[in-house]
């Protein structure tokens, strides 16, 4: 049960930040109606499925062969494998989003990011011009800034000038430049677009896995578990009758898992309709607006050139009259 708790926490971490309302409902369905039911009820129902599978023969190996024919994969193991595979795209999305957030934090607090945010005009001579006083002041400011940055952290200039290797590092607040704010905003927007795109991709893969497991469950087990199973597989010397334990209870459980899988497929399609198509429409509209603006700028910048008409004219002075 501890392994299922870890999986639940990981799924909740993915949903809390980036998922839609439909995704939250889907998480509830997966956690309550799948993980908890399979972990608590399923183990009790299918605990003795092989030991209670009895055939009316004493032939050695006949019971095992007939059980393998009746249930190629145990119901409970099939559903556990289904839960793991269906949750894999969400776990990949968690890894991607955490990686992007870590990269954003590193880019925000790195010294390269601080250097890029500085105005080039200030490094030349400040807003006052490129004179001697401004140049000398800017050089002194650059030297102070270099002395203030130790190990990638902005330090107190007074303590840094006195001590070569400070024991206590004091961080000073840096006022961001407008260009740096624009760069950070564009970087954050690109990161959010990448996360949204990856979220749509993982929903598509998750829905494909749901449909695949739903079809596989139908071809393996059907919609019912028979109480009597006839088997003539080797090493049985003749056709024998085998009896399945708790057939009605297993049939109810099988139909319930069919219903849960169908609900998950419908919720995935609804989330794609809510999230995916809207994103596609916005992307198409943005691309069209961008092409239109580029076309207008090019037509505005290019000079108008009159093209001579080399065709036949209707003038009376024409040579072809």
UniProtKB/Swiss-Prot annotation:
Localisation: Cell membrane; Cell junction, Gap junction
Full protein name: Gap junction delta-2 protein
Keywords in alphabetical order: Cell junction, Cell membrane, Gap junction, Membrane, Transmembrane, Transmembrane helix
One Pfam family hit: Connexin
Organism: Mus musculus
Function per UniProt: One gap junction consists of a cluster of closely packed pairs of transmembrane channels, the connexons, through which materials of low MW diffuse from one cell to a neighboring cell.
Gly residues bias (residue ranges): 125-137
Keyword field contains Chloroplast: no
Superkingdom of origin organism: Eukaryota
UniProt xrefs under SMART domains: CNX, Connexin_CCC
């Amino acid at each position: 049960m501890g392994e299922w708790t870890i999986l639940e926490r990981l799924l909740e971490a993915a949903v809390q930040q980036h998922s839609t309302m439909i995704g939250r409902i889907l998480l509830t369905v997966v956690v309550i109606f799948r993980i908890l039911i399979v972990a608590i009820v399923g183990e009790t129902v299918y605990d003795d499925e092989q030991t209670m599978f009895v055939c009316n023969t004493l032939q050695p190996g006949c019971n095992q062969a007939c059980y393998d024919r009746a249930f190629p994969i145990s119901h409970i193991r099939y559903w556990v494998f289904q839960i793991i595979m269906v949750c894999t795209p969400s776990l990949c999305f968690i890894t991607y989003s955490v990686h992007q957030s870590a990269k954003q934090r590193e880019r925000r607090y790195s010294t390269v990011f601080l250097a890029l945010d500085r105005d080039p005009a200030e490094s030349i001579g400040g807003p006052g011009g490129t004179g001697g006083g401004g140049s000398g002041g800017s050089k002194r400011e650059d030297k102070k800034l270099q002395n203030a940055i130790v190990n990638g952290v902005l330090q107190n200039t007074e303590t840094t000038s006195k001590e070569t290797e400070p024991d206590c590092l004091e961080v000073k607040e840096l006022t961001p430049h407008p260009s740096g704010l624009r760069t950070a905003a564009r970087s954050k927007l690109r990161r959010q677009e990448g996360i949204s795109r990856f979220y749509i991709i993982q929903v598509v893969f998750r829905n494909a896995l749901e449909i695949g497991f739903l079809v596989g469950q139908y071809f393996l087990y059907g919609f019912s578990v028979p109480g009597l199973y006839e088997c003539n597989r080797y090493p049985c010397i003749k056709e024998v009758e085998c009896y399945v334990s708790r057939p009605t209870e297993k049939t109810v459980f099988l139909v319930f898992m069919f219903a849960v899988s169908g609900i998950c497929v419908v919720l995935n399609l609804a989330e794609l309709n809510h999230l995916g198509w809207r994103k596609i429409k916005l992307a198409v509209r943005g691309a069209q607006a961008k092409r239109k603006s580029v076309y207008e700028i090019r037509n505005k910048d290019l000079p108008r050139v009159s093209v001579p008409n080399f065709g036949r004219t209707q003038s009376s002075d024409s040579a072809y009259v």
